[in-house]
Amino acid sequence: MNSRLRHWREAATLLLAAGAPARPPRSPLGPFDYELLLLQRSSRSGFAPSAHVFPGGLVEAADFSADWLGLLPASPQCGLGLVRPPPPGSCRAPLFATDRVQLGSPLPGEVAFRICAIRETFEEAGILLLVPGRGPAAGSGPAPPLPAARLPPAAELSEWRRRVQEDPACFLQLCRHLGCVPNIWALQEWSNWLTPVGRTGRGARRYDAAFYLCCLERRPPLTSQDDREVTAFLWSSPPEAIERFKSQEIWFPPPQFYELCRLCNFSSFHELHKFSSDRALEGCERWMPVMLTASDGDIELLPGKKTDEGSFKCIKAWKLLHTQAT
């Protein structure tokens, strides 16, 4: 947790994909054999009210607690693979490149941000992404859900969920109680988004968010909204989610919209898992969209996108997104 930041706060987000039987598609892209978990934020939320988002939230000091080192493997990076050095002309996202030891935590950022994403997924959706023992889980395929036999009774699990929501440090206590650890090895580094400076100017909420992708063999046995920050949930394939957006059934903030469009390139669950595992070794750069105000709406420009005819489709998509949101 970086307390030195003044203009934004660090966060972690999880794109949770679960294998599912392919069914007749709602979009021309054909059938997809996996679904993504989407959560609807409360209409009272101070950030993106009523939007559908991926699970995630702010990093807490408990996510960087040295006590995690007593549960996780003692190997470097707790057994996570090493990211290759960035090519010339690019750099590792500051979120990951920051030396956390200098900030008072012996836990690497790559570990703590994954713990945050897993904790928030439990708080918001009731899903526990854990593995028995000290991990990592055996095998290289999509991760299996935690066996139901390892879960406490529903009432006890609900009480643990409430406790973690009230005090993030209770998540480590829950892991000890269950004899499990967060399945950080199932989360692949995917992207890094920094909230742009919006029309409200200085003082608006901004987040530097690490986005991870996790592939599960199948849907977890239990999924439920917390009826606090989250009022509903939806499992949907990427193209179906985009179709729902186009028909204005649901609305996505720009990063979610972009990532869903990106996932539309993968109709095969196992191809997505392989790509994400291989691609994670490359790391990622921080992206901060730049706001462009037009006469009929707002546009968010991404790195590498120019305001010429060749990029018109991209700009039109973002313009449509903001026009519908305002």
Where are these regions (language model features)?
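N-terminal leader/linker segments that precede catalytic domains of diphosphate-processing enzymes
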Residues: 1-326
